[in-house]
């Protein structure tokens, strides 16, 4: 039996594992007024990215293909900005945003899974960052504050756009639009249609035209599109009723 097991290990070596998400220190109990403490957990729709898979988002080469600085530049994230990330998951991009806006800025990290938000709070505590507020949203309302300079949905729209309720994502985007300043920007980053790369399988990738259609129905207009080969693309939206800056 031992010989058979050893032979199987030689013939079928283990696939190289993605790094596990870092272990962060335990958190003190959040204050009663914390943004997500008083909210009820949202009812998940479709297949959600679970906490057990967060290691997939921590690949050492992610910064190379995700292009966080270029994305933040495109949606106007600067020192002192007030921004939000929807579907923040493990907080990889939340960390990028928090470092960019600095101590005078504020990042609202939204997710519909409480466990994700707890992980983000631990991560920010470990990084000694105090400019991040977690927000427990729903599939149709991210519960964001008004006056945002920018909002970001990074590699998560394909999970928000579900067949069970096709209007939920339109309602979600409409609520984002209401939270933006007149000249605020929404960036949506998702996986280039087709196969390959670290993203979801081809059938779960979203054609950018589908996103543009949903955003238009939500009162947003496309301002710019940029492709970041080989894995992702970026769509930048503004409020359709916003008056141009003089």
Q: Model segments located where?
A:
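Class I SAM-dependent methyltransferase SAM/SAH-binding core
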Residues: 84-142
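A short glycine-rich, Lys/Arg-flanked "PGG" loop and its adjoining helix->strand segment in the class I
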Residues: 98-99, 167-185
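A short acidic, Gly/Pro-enriched loop at the edge of an enzyme's catalytic core
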Residues: 140-151
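Short glycine-dipeptide loop
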Residues: 79-80, 103-105, 180-186
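Conserved class I S-adenosyl-L-methionine
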Residues: 117, 185-212
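Hydrophobic beta-strand segment of the Class I
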Residues: 83, 151-152
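Class I SAM-dependent transferase core
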Residues: 33-84, 92, 118-122
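Core SAM-dependent methyltransferase catalytic element
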Residues: 221-224, 228-246
């Amino acid at each position: 039996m031992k010989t058979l097991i050893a032979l199987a290990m030689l013939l079928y070596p283990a696939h190289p594992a993605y790094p596990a998400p870092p272990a962060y220190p335990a958190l003190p109990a959040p204050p009663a007024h914390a943004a997500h403490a008083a909210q009820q957990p949202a009812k998940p729709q479709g297949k959600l990215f679970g906490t057990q898979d967060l290691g997939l988002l921590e690949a050492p080469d992610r910064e190379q293909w995700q292009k966080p600085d270029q994305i933040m530049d495109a949606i106007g994230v600067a020192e002192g900005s007030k921004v939000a990330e929807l579907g923040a998951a493990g907080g990889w991009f939340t960390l990028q945003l928090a470092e960019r806006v600095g101590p005078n800025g504020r990042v609202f990290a939204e997710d519909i899974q409480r466990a994700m938000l707890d992980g983000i709070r631990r991560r920010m505590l470990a990084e000694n960052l105090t400019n991040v507020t977690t927000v427990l949203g729903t599939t149709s309302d991210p519960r964001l504050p008004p006056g945002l300079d920018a909002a970001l949905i990074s590699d998560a729209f394909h999970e928000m756009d579900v067949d069970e309720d096709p209007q939920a994502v339109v309602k979600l985007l409409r609520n984002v639009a209401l939270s933006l300043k007149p000249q605020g920007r929404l960036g949506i980053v998702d996986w280039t249609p087709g196969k390959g790369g670290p993203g979801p399988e081809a059938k779960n990738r979203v054609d950018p035209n589908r996103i543009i259609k949903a955003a238009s129905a939500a009162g947003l207009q496309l301002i710019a599109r940029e492709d970041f080969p080989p894995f992702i693309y970026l769509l930048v939206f503004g409020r359709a009723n916003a008056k141009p800056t003089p």
